[in-house]
Amino acid sequence: MKAAWLLALAAGPIVGSIAAGEEARVFRAACVKVDITPETPQWLQGYRPRRSEGVHDRIYHRIAAMDDGTTTFFLVSTDICTITPPYYDALCERLERELGIEPGRVWWSTTHTHSAPHVGPQDLGPLFVATLGDRYSIEHDRAYWARVTDALVAGIEQARSRLEPARLGVVTGTARANVNRRERKADGRIALGVHPEGPVDRQVGLIRLERPDGTPIALVANYAIHGTALGGGNTQISGDVPGFVAEYVEGKVGAPLLFVNGAEGNVAPLYSVGSNIHDPRLKEYETLLGDAIVAANASMTATTADVSLALGKTVVETPRRAGLGWTDRLADYASVSDDGTPQVRVPVYSLTINRDTVIWAAPLELFCEIAMNVRDASPFANTLYFGLTNGSLLYLPTKAAFAEGGYEPNVSPFTDRAEADFTSAVTR
C-alpha cells in the first residue's frame, strides 16, 4: 500500500507535539561509540572474496539516542557494508524482548565500507551470480556476527541510560568529495568508473546534539558516497571514507560523528586508490569531506531544546525483476499484485523533527537523482535521505539507467517502473 507521508506530515499535526497549556517536555540525548573491530581474520564484504590480513583503522557502532518526552529514538551507524532487512527485523525483535523497545524506534544504518567483515546472511546478492560471481562463496563467522549484534544491543541500552538534557540543530552544507560513477565507454557501454558530468548529490546534512552549555554530544552527518576508496585488492580492515572522515571530525569537535550514507547508488568517492592503503590521496578526504562537515557544524547559528519527534513508516510495492528468484528469509518483502505480477515490498521510514526537518530512510542503494527529486518536492526546510538503513534490497536505479544498462541495473531486483512508483509514494 502506498502511503503519502512526506507531504502529509508537513500539513498535519506532528505526532507527540505539545498541546497548548501542557508543561514543556525536556529533550534529552546521548551517544555511545562501541568498538567492533574483529580480533581474527574475517571475510570482507564487497568486491571478490578476500580474507582480512590486518587492521588499518578500527571500526565501530556509533549510537545516538534521542528522547522528546514521548518518543525515544535510536540511530545507529555501523562501519560495515550492508545487512539484510530480515537481520534488522531480528534485531528489532530482540530489542523488544530484552529492552522493551518497540520495533521501528531503532534505525540501523551501515556506512557501506567495502573493507569490513560480512555480518549476517546475504539474501539477494547470491541471486545475481551471473554479475557478482563468487563474491558470496565464503565462510560465515557467526561468532563475529553475534559479537556485533550483542555489542549493538548493549550499546543501545547504554545510550538509553545516559540520556541527558540536550539541544538539537540541523544545517546543510556542501562537499565535493564524490562523483558520478556511471562512465560511458567509447563503444557506448556504461561501466563503473568516473562520469564527471553525471548527476551527483553533494549536500552534507548535519544534525548536532549538544548539552545546554553548548558542548557537543554527537554529530550526525549525511552524505552520498560509496565506501570504495579502497579497492578490491585491499585486505586491511577499514571504515574507508566514512570511517576516515568520522575519526577526523571527532578529533576536531570532541564528540562522536555518526556517518549515515545518502543516495550513493550511482555515486563514488572522488578518488579510489585500489589496494594502496598508504596512498596520500586518502588523507584528502579529511579536507574534502571532513572539513566540510566541520564547517557546517561551525555555521550552525541556533539549536533548540524544544524538540518534537514523529516516526512514520510506509511500504512501497513495485514490480520485481522478471525471472528473479527470491528467498524464504525475504518472504515479508515480497507480494503478488492483483494481475499476478511478483512485487518487491520496500519499507520506507520517516523521522520528522519539529516542523522544519524530515528524514526519510530505506534499505536501498538509491540513485541520487531520485533522492534529489524528492528533496526538491519536499515542503520541509531540511530533507535528508538515509540510505542503506534497516537493511539492503540492493540498487534502485532511475528509469533512464535501466535503459542504459550497466552494473547497477544488472544487480537490481526492480524494474524501470521503480523510480516512478517510489517517488510518487513518498511525495504525493
Label each region the model flagged.
Residues G16-E22:
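Signal peptide processing junction and immediate N-terminal pro/mature segment
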